[in-house]
A protein has these predicted regions:
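Non-catalytic terminal/linker segments enriched in charged/polar, low-complexity residues
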Residues: 1-175, 193, 220
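P-loop/Walker A NTP-binding module and the surrounding RecA-like catalytic core of P-loop NTPases
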Residues: 144-147, 173-394
Length: 394
């Protein structure tokens, strides 16, 4: 599935460990010293002192965080997997993709049926466009995207002299594909080491589960992953992410009740010291209207950049595909606060509001990296504009 990975490694990286708890079965791999050239973890508190007014004091949280105090840390270090020196793009098995496309079409069936019903006429006239307008609005495509698509469709019909509803449907599929095409971009891993990915979203969007799935796919693609459990508020959030860390045999940095920004700093610093390829930072769910929590997200972002000058390299927002136009509002709010680089759309299995991606493409075209249609690992796949367009129209 991850044929989009682009990795620039000139040599095989080795991992060092110190000042952390190592499980007995892996103790033989833990004797390698940490290269001090990467980062010093002795006293980074001063770096985030200026942010201590938001979300708690930075320095004490650093002292309690996963890296600096092993007794408060839940860290797991699996046997190292030596990454390949060069990773070529991997071809995804066609059968797996075909099965997923079937699930996507099934998931968007309610949306597709509404739009397909508009083509149940015998001729192409103004009534057809009126039915399409109603169908697109019901699918939560939004006023702007609906008006744009209808104008584009009429131009295509005129230029091609289309005369049947079947021909018009094909032209609409082309119009939707062209509208969604700017959202189809690859997630690039390997340009920076580590690649720091910050993940945000509202409560219940499936953020932590999505991180777990993404971790599995990254690991299978030869990437060494470190998880940062910066959701220190939700009950059992740390434990839920720890379960995914155990399943995927990756390291996790966590601290009960610690400061999320301080923990994120420690996680990035630890990843630099141990030559990890990817850091996934899980943050607490919040509504855009909770301004103090949005300020905390900004603090986490600033603190990550102090641990690594170029980080975060990706800021992803997980949105629930069932929320329709509310998802667009979330994208706008989080983008203004964090400067989003990508989206992950979940829970598209059974939604009648799949047209919201058209609204996002028209009003806030943030790339969509992944689309989820279920709970299984293989249900999270890369976004393709043509495939989504065909599934959307039924």
């Amino acid at each position: 599935m991850f044929s989009f990975f682009k990795k620039k490694l000139s040599e095989v990286l080795q991992s060092g460990r110190e000042d952390v708890h190592t499980p007995p079965e892996q103790a033989s791999d833990a004797g390698m010293p940490v290269d001090e050239a990467f980062c010093s973890l002795d006293d980074p508190a001063g770096l985030i002192q200026e942010d201590s007014a938001i979300g708690g004091a930075g320095a004490p949280a650093l002292q309690e965080s996963a890296v600096s105090t092993p007794q408060e840390t839940h860290a797991r270090f699996p046997p190292e997997q030596t990454p390949p020196a060069v990773t070529e793009p991997q071809q995804e098995p066609e059968s797996d993709r075909s099965r997923w496309l079937g699930r996507l079409k099934t998931g968007l069936k309610r949306t597709g049926n509404t739009i397909s019903a508009a083509f149940g006429v015998s001729q192409v006239d103004e009534s057809l466009y009126e039915e399409l307008e109603s169908a697109l609005l019901m699918a939560d495509a939004g006023v702007q995207a609906t008006a744009y698509l209808l104008d584009d469709l009429k131009r295509r019909v005129k230029s091609t002299c289309a005369e049947t509803p079947v021909q018009v449907r094909a032209l609409l599929a082309d119009a939707v594909t062209d509208l969604l095409q700017p959202l189809q971009k690859p997630l690039v891993i390997g340009e920076y080491t580590p690649t720091v990915i910050m993940v945000a979203g509202v409560n219940g969007a499936g953020k932590t589960t999505t991180i777990g799935k993404l971790t599995r796919h990254l690991s299978e693609a030869g990437q060494s992953v470190l998880l940062a459990a910066a959701d220190t508020f939700r009950a059992a959030a740390r434990e839920q992410l720890s379960v995914w860390a155990d399943r995927n045999m990756v390291e996790i940095v966590s601290s009960a009740g610690g400061d999320p920004a301080a923990l994120s700093f420690d996680a990035v610093a630890a990843a630099k010291a141990r030559n990890k390829h990817v850091v996934l930072v899980d943050t607490a769910g919040r509504l855009p209207t909770q301004l103090h929590l949005m300020d905390e997200l900004k603090k986490i972002r600033r603190t990550i950049s102090k641990a690594c000058d170029t980080a975060p390299h990706e800021v992803l927002l997980v949105i629930d595909g069932n929320t329709g136009q509310n998802a667009l509002a979330q994208v706008k709010a989080f983008d203004e606060a964090l400067q989003l680089t990508g989206l992950i759309v979940t829970k598209l299995d059974g939604t009648a509001k799949g047209g919201v991606l058209c609204a996002i493409a028209r009003e806030r075209p943030v790339p969509v990296y992944f689309v989820g249609v279920g709970e299984k690992l293989e249900d999270l796949q890369t976004f393709n504009a043509r495939e989504f367009s065909e599934a959307l129209l039924g």
